[in-house]
A protein has these predicted regions:
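Repeated loop/turn-to-beta-strand initiation elements of outer-membrane beta-barrel proteins
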Residues: 78-81, 119-124, 169-173, 235-238, ...
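Outer-membrane beta-barrel "beta-signal"
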Residues: 304-318
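Extracellular loop and loop/strand-boundary signature of outer-membrane beta-barrel proteins
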Residues: 52-58, 93-99, 143-149, 206-214, ...
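Outer-membrane beta-barrel translocator domains and adjoining extracellular loop/strand segments
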Residues: 52-56, 95-99, 137-143, 185-192, ...
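Detector for outer-membrane/organellar transmembrane beta-barrel domains
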Residues: 155, 159-246
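Transmembrane beta-strands of outer-membrane beta-barrel pores
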Residues: 44-50, 76-78, 87-93, 128-136, ...
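Transmembrane beta-strand segments of Gram-negative outer membrane beta-barrel proteins
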Residues: 32-48, 79-81
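Residues on the lipid-exposed face of transmembrane beta-strands in outer-membrane beta-barrel proteins
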Residues: 40, 44-46, 66-74, 108-114, ...
């Protein structure tokens, strides 16, 4: 009798255990997949030249760039919310020359979009973009007078429009008829010079300061952006990003251009080669040129800015 009761107890216990395991399994399988996707990417890019008894001559040099990219993206049937933080900083050192900055960026992007039709690839969107830099910038070899600083300048874009997302988000196109652009120049010395398009200081005939330069310039205009990310061939990824802006109130039709084209060539999980170019044109950024050592000015106006990159990088993603 005792043995029968013991066997019945074991049988009931096993049934309860299996039922509990089955319930837990079903609960896990019914948990909704997270609609958030995250990306954390750290990249270190290096270039180096070294010469020993090289008959053609040359300077030893080493360059390094650190890049951090963080993304937090949300998407459901009707709503998309994309957030991105980008930062990069680069330095270069050559023999018999001071340490020089080669790259400096802090950028924050956020886009919120809504569609009322699941079949549509166009979203009514609000887009925010902010850019500035970490440290002082100089027109080398002159390091006595900075030409830019942290928050001098800083750019802020905020607009409403419509954005297209391809099926796999490889291609994004944003069109905004109304975007507010704010240019901050918080350093008063740069603001007094009228740097980056803000109103300069006003002086009387004796050179006495009458009114300080403005620290803020506000514009309203048209904003267009596109980004295309694709794998052009095996282990070669391309990112082509273009931003265009034109102010309604001041010289409408003069377009500010920000165009980045980058290729990542994957060698293995943690090593890549990087080839890239960055073109900037801003009608408010005036470049100075001198004729001679006396500092005689011959030109003051906007110019196309170009930066190129070729290097080997170490990548860590988590």
């Amino acid at each position: 009798m005792g043995l029968k009761l013991f066997l019945i107890f074991i049988f009931i216990y096993n049934l309860n255990t299996k039922a509990s395991i089955l319930k837990d399994t079903l609960d896990i399988s019914q948990e909704p997949l997270s609609q958030w996707k995250k990306t954390n990417n750290i990249k270190l890019i290096f270039t180096q030249n070294s010469f020993v008894n090289w008959s053609a001559g040359g300077n030893n040099s080493i360059s390094g760039i650190a890049k951090i990219n963080i993304e937090r993206n949300y998407k459901n049937n009707y709503t998309v919310w994309k957030n991105e933080l980008k930062s990069s900083y680069g330095l270069n050192k050559e023999d018999r020359r001071e340490l020089r900055k080669t790259e400096d960026l802090i950028e924050l992007n956020s886009t919120f979009g809504y569609r009322n039709n699941m079949k549509s690839k166009w979203y009514s969107s609000v887009k925010f973009n902010f850019r500035t830099q970490f440290t002082n910038g100089y027109k080398y070899p002159n390091t006595d007078k900075p030409i830019s600083k942290f928050f001098s300048p800083a750019y802020n874009f905020l607009g409403i429009g419509s954005e297209y997302f391809s099926k796999e988000d490889e291609l994004k196109i944003y069109l905004s008829p109304i975007t507010n652009k704010m240019t901050f120049v918080c350093n008063q010395s740069l603001a007094d010079e009228g740097a980056f398009g803000v109103a300069p200081a006003i002086y009387d005939d004796s050179g006495n300061l009458v009114k300080e330069g403005e620290n803020l310039k506000v514009e309203v205009g048209t904003f267009i952006s596109s980004e295309w990310k694709t794998e052009v061939m095996e282990n070669i990824k391309m990112n082509n990003k273009l931003i265009l802006y034109s102010d309604y109130l001041n010289k409408y039709g003069n377009v500010d251009v920000n165009w980045e084209l980058n290729f990542d060539l994957t060698i293995n999980k943690h090593v890549t080669a990087n080839v890239g170019s960055h073109i900037l044109y801003d009608d408010d950024v005036k470049h100075k040129e001198d004729v001679n050592n006396n500092g005689e000015l011959i030109a003051l106006g906007p110019k196309i800015q170009l930066k190129q990159l070729l290097g080997i990088g170490l990548v860590y993603a988590f």
